[in-house]
């Protein structure tokens, strides 16, 4: 489902550091359970620590990541949504929750 082209909104491209973009895609790729079409990432910070809570609904999954970052931690809710185009080719889009 997440094996096709990957897209991001202009806002994700502009506001989310590339390191975090790549990390979120990797979190999806490494999921140890079947992937839901909707992946949810809640980002927050504590000092110089970035905290990411990754979840999906079906099957239920949740994992927390925490690590030091050389930039101000990002606070946001991000969706990655998997879909199929008119030719039934899979693709996924990363966007801020409020862009949905």
Per-region residue spans from a language model:
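Short, compact, well-ordered microdomains
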Residues: 60-100
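N-terminal "domain-start" segment
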Residues: 1-70
């Amino acid at each position: 489902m997440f094996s096709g082209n990957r897209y991001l909104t202009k806002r994700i491209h502009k506001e989310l550091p590339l390191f975090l973009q790549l990390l979120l895609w990797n979190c999806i790729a490494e999921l140890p359970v079947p992937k839901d079409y909707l992946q949810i990432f809640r980002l927050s910070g504590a000092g110089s620590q970035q905290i990411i809570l990754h979840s999906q609904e079906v099957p239920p999954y949740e994992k927390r990541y925490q690590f030091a970052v050389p930039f101000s931690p990002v606070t946001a809710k991000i969706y990655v949504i998997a879909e199929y185009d008119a030719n039934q080719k899979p693709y996924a889009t990363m966007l801020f929750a409020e862009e949905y």
